[in-house]
Amino acid sequence: MLPNHPPLVVAEQFGTLETLYPGRIDLGLGRAPGTDMRTLQALRRDPQDAERFPSDVVELQGLLSDTSPLAGIEAIPGKGTNVPLYILGSSLFGAQLAAALGLPYAFASHFAPQALTEAVALYRREFRPSEVLAEPYVIAGVGAIADEDAERANTGWRRFLTFNFVCGFVVTMLLIWLWVLVP
């Protein structure tokens, strides 16, 4: 949710964590605001901040390195900590950005399981090696239902599928209704 926070503030916060716990901190960067408009306003952020996500990632990467991209501005602490960055996503946009920047990519397939294969293939195909990563590195978050009893696990899975089908149907019908009836 990088659009909710200025890169300098994130660099200082994660620089502090890295200073306290060296080698134990990773930073996942997502583009989605993850909030409603009122909360976004309370954070003093603009809905268009998500459009600056790629440049904010590059700026943050620079603030955590030894060379700040902003003349006369340094993240203290943060400068030189080189906290590992991961691009988080559930669409092809995140895969393309992670590939272009040579960063690891974590795909939220529990949000968009149908896009997992295409996003990972795109990331691997377009990956450009960088100073931080020589080869593509993918993490996939997946939804799973587990139980010691197979029948209870299967029941949980069927409930999950039914819930998602009903929710998807309702959202689709609402969108069709809005598209057809609202000018």
What are these model-derived regions, one by one?
Residues 1-2, 30-34, 90, 110, ...:
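Active-site beta-loop-alpha junctions enriched in small/polar residues
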Residues 3-65, 105, 113:
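Flexible, glycine-rich active-site loops centered on histidine and acidic residues
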Residues 14, 18-24, 97-100, 124-135:
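Acidic (Asp/Glu)-rich catalytic clusters
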Residues 25-29, 83-88, 105-108, 136-142:
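Hydrophobic faces of well-ordered beta-strands that scaffold small-molecule active sites
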Residues 38-42, 99, 151:
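Short aromatic-enriched loop/helix-cap "lid" or pocket-rim segments at secondary-structure transitions
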Residues 47-75, 115-183:
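An alpha-helical appendage that flanks or caps ligand/catalytic pockets
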Residues 68-71, 83-91:
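Core active-site phosphate/anionic-ligand binding loop and the adjoining beta-turn-alpha structural block
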Residues 93-95, 99-111, 119-120:
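A conserved active-site cap/scaffold subdomain adjacent to cofactor or substrate pockets
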